[in-house]
Amino acid sequence: MHISKFKIMRKTMLIVLSVFISISSCKKDDPIYDINQIQSNSYNANKTKLKTPGQYISILYANLFQQALSANELVEITRCIESVGDKEIVHEVIISNFMNKEGVTIPSDSLMRADLNSFIEETYKRFYVRDITEAEREYFLNFFESHPNISSEMVYTAFSLSNEYQFY
């Protein structure tokens, strides 16, 4: 009798163990997606060289006035930049002076607000010489929507002072 109880108990344990193992081992496989590997670069990954003061001023003037800066003015402004230690402040002063000159080619604020998408695209091509990414577009559209007092002059100033604009 003792042996038969042992056999029954053993069979019961085997059945319980089998059921437990089969329940715990039957899992649905996680889906595996085929993803194409692509090489992703930063938007400004190829811009590694810092512009010289002469390059910065020439390009800035061309972007703002849509014409070349005279050699005399270029030398004078370049000397001004090189004579001051804090380049950021000098750049701000130069941009401010350029913005106050006649002949600056900046779209009016009403024109900017009328078609923000094309304004943003043209500004990126003009200053960064590249296309805008969708994330940047979305950011700027939201930014302009939440800041109605931003002018096109402020946008051009910000792009001219940005880190990406300092490199080529």
Walk through the language-model features, giving the residues of each.
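N-terminal secretory signal peptides that target proteins for export/translocation
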Residues: 1-9
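Substrate/cofactor-recognition hotspot
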Residues: 27-168
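C-terminal motif of bacterial Sec signal peptides marking the signal peptidase cleavage site
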Residues: 22-25
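Sec-dependent signal peptide recognition
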Residues: 10-16
